[in-house]
Amino acid sequence: MNYVPSQPETARPHAAALVATAKGQKLLQTGKLVKEYKHRRVVNGVSIEVGAGEIVGLLGPNGAGKTTTFNMVVGVVRPDEGEVNYMGRDISKLAMHDRARLGVGYLTQEPSVFRKLTVEENILAILETCEMSRDERKIRLKYLLEELDLTPLAKSKAYTLSGGEKRRLEITRALVTSPKLLLLDEPFAGIDPIAVYEVQKILRRLRDRGLGLLITDHSAREMLKLIDRGYIIVKGQVLIEGSAEFLANDPKAREIYLGTEFNL
């Protein structure tokens, strides 16, 4: 079912905070990505895909190539070979801001909020870069605050927020441009278990609204609690792919990455 926010008809084209896409539609496909540094091939033919309405994880040991793969999707790193396709279009050579215009959102690992601005000012700072009227910005702001449970914190300075509240604000800012695909780098880093649970709940809500999400995080347990599918990358290649349950119980995944005593 397509998601349509309940807002005035005149404001909807600009005010919809989330863009619904038919579930299962392929949003992201990478074709045999290759990256070398100083004659060392750190990514060697990685192919992944993300559809609308699903959460996909990139997992693997440190130095396995998952971060480089993720950064090629984001646009921070350009592949030496292979393609990054978004909705059937090769975006391998596009800058990050051009990818954003097409509907690719990005939540960086580094703090991205303005500490001395309030929560609503942080969101407005992004909204003001969008082509819409002042009234439409107000409608969108109200909607985003409600969608990410930030309304009670709207007037709070960002530096007063907890780690989990800041992460919710960062996710909100990433949603301002109405992305169809959201890329999240270490969304669970630096936040406590309760905040992790809240962030997971929000990400599931976004998935259920039709967004596609690609996540990389060092917490395998929290990732596997959340994702619908995942890829375990080892030595620059996809070693195993499948559902969270499949990955958690795969003997090879447990031997090489998760550990034999791992459990969800």
Predicted regions: what they are:
Residues 182-186:
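Catalytic Walker B motif of ABC-type/P-loop ATPase nucleotide-binding domains
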Residues 59-61:
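The feature captures the beta-strand-to-loop junction immediately N-terminal to the Walker
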Residues 74:
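Helix-to-loop junction immediately C-terminal to a conserved catalytic motif
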Residues 18, 124, 135-153, 200-204:
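Conserved ABC ATPase "signature" region
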